[in-house]
Amino acid sequence: MDLSELERDNTGRCRLSSPVPAVCLKEPCVLGVDEAGRGPVLGPMVYAICYCPLSRLADLEALKVADSKTLTENERERLFAKMEEDGDFVGWALDVLSPNLISTSMLGRVKYNLNSLSHDTAAGLIQYALDQNVNVTQVFVDTVGMPETYQARLQQHFPGIEVTVKAKADSLFPVVSAASIFAKVARDKAVKNWQFVENLQDLDSDYGSGYPNDPKTKAWLRKHVDPVFGFPQFVRFSWSTAQAILEKEAEDVIWEDSEAEEDPERPGKITSYFSQGPQTCRPQAPHRYFQERGLEAASSL
């Protein structure tokens, strides 16, 4: 698995895929979707699909694929290599979503929460397989959120495909188990080979599991937080654990919007115009356009 594209630029997203097996262009195929790294405060989240012909599903099961969380790293690597060898009937694709992309999506002016990002990434990978002319007839997905709602959404988006969304799908359906292995192997490689663009002093590679409740992970975050610039891009700064450390260890930042909220001359809430109490008339500050240009209203010229 070549992650060189991600290593060159780990600020956005990276898509990797195998060649499409010729048989998958002709025969009806089943496709599984799963992710790795949804919960950690460190490193990317990886979504993966795996697909194969329905007629070869028994061959995939014979590899004894299982939920990646139940396998050791060596077992995952062995199964990944075996599925790569079986490239004549097994195909895969994955999206690597950087911590920076996840955090800026969640904290942007227009919020894009993790569930929506996950749903759209999964749908994008299914669409990618279809765009590659893979003859997908069945899709199995490990759920994010309510499975019924998620399934209805995917079914509406892909009306010609039989979609099944289940909790713990990675332990129920071999094709989802295979996808979970691809996702986990890719994330482990991405984390292990992460290129820090920041000039960190005494970089500690022992950060524990990467999950927010891990004491080692918390200690790593406290050690590598900059009081002005915050965390390296390896950190999902939208996670509450990271935000709490920033508030305690970093310098306070006053944003222009924050100043405006504390300005006594800012306009009142719209609901104040409909309240029954005594109305207080407050002067309104001019629009930002006029303030920046030093323009004021004039009654005479």
UniProtKB/Swiss-Prot annotation:
Keyword Hydrolase applies: yes
Gene Ontology MF, one: metal ion binding
Record field: compositional bias (Polar residues): 272-282
Record EC number: 3.1.26.4
Gene Ontology process terms (BP): mismatch repair; RNA catabolic process
Residue ranges of domain RNase H type-2 in the record: 28-251
Enzyme class: hydrolase
Pfam families from the UniProt entry: RNase_HII (PF01351)
Result after altering D142N: Loss of enzyme activity
Residues modified as Phosphoserine: S258
UniProt binding sites for a divalent metal cation: D34, E35, D142
Cellular-component GO terms for this entry: cytosol; nucleoplasm; ribonuclease H2 complex
NCBIfam families according to UniProt: ribonuclease HII
Protein's recorded name: Ribonuclease H2 subunit A
